[in-house]
Amino acid sequence: LGDVYKDSLLPPADWVGALGGRVVRWQPFDHEPIRAAGRQVFGIDALPSHDFSRARQIVSFGADFLETWLSPIENQRGFAEAHGFRNGQMARHVFVAPRMSLTGLNADQWLGVAPGSEALVALAMANLILSERTSAPADANALRSSLSAYTPEMAAQAAGVEAEEIRRLCRHLRGI
């Protein structure tokens, strides 16, 4: 035990193994769905790391990134940099979620939606933004078709908010 203790650079498994135990890791939040999405969309088997420090607009759909989501300390550092005045400007943060949280408290706007409706609001926003673009990418027709059912009215009804709130958020994102 003395040799194990004096070498503080031993990995936990080696240190615990020297004591006759085994390492058990437990994580209260399962990140496998996020990893699976990264594999499917980007071909990368890793958790994302977001650089909030360079953001001008942050819209979070239920991701409580300042409290429990992925790397809260890293996210808090970047958010503080983006949300503090930089060259006379600061990032705007909108939190779309059913409950007020630490992330929501730090938002410039909280859009309180019904639980489980965050994705519908995001899809309605994507539909609205894409349909109002004057110069959409050439291959946007398939995406337009997929999003056409997700109107601000449909999402607003499911989310328990006004459709105009969704439109206003889209206008702000586009800088109108």
Mark where each language-model region is:
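Cofactor-pocket helix-loop regions in the catalytic cores of large enzyme subunits
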Residues: 1-176
